[in-house]
A protein has these predicted regions:
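Auxiliary N-terminal substrate/complex-recognition segments of SAM-dependent methyltransferases
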Residues: 1-126
Length: 126
């Protein structure tokens, strides 16, 4: 049964993954992000895997990436170089690489985050 008060489109997936529905509801009621339970989010049309090693991409960041893509397309007519400092999940670097003629370097001080970013880059063919 899908509760009306929890807006999770992947409820069926979650209940299969977490067979104990009470445990699942307990986690959600503590504020644990459903994105971590699901394991991925959509960001700029890309599937981005997320877990506790990285922050969950925000809608506002998607807007920033869209504006950056539009600006770069208007201002540059050649291949550009982009550095994504503190890449986390890699969602920004992946989205920029897929939408711009560019060299993209993603950096982070966390090896765990770089592992997530690398797997997301492979997942999204970038």
């Amino acid at each position: 049964m899908k509760p009306d008060y929890i807006s999770i489109p992947d409820w069926e997936l979650l209940t299969k993954k977490y067979l104990d529905t009470n445990k699942l509801l307990e986690l959600l009621s503590t504020g644990y992000p459903p994105q971590y339970l699901i394991g991925n989010v959509e960001f700029c049309g890309n599937i981005i895997n997320v877990d506790e090693r990285v922050l969950i991409p925000r809608f506002e960041t998607e807007t920033l990436v869209d504006k950056t893509i539009n600006y770069a397309k208007e201002m540059f007519n050649k291949k550009i170089s982009i550095i994504d400092l503190g890449t986390g999940s890699g969602c920004i670097a992946i989205s920029l690489k897929k939408n711009l003629d560019s060299f993209v370097t993603a950096l982070d001080i966390s090896n765990d985050a770089l592992e997530v970013a690398e797997s997301n880059a492979l997942l999204n063919n970038t």
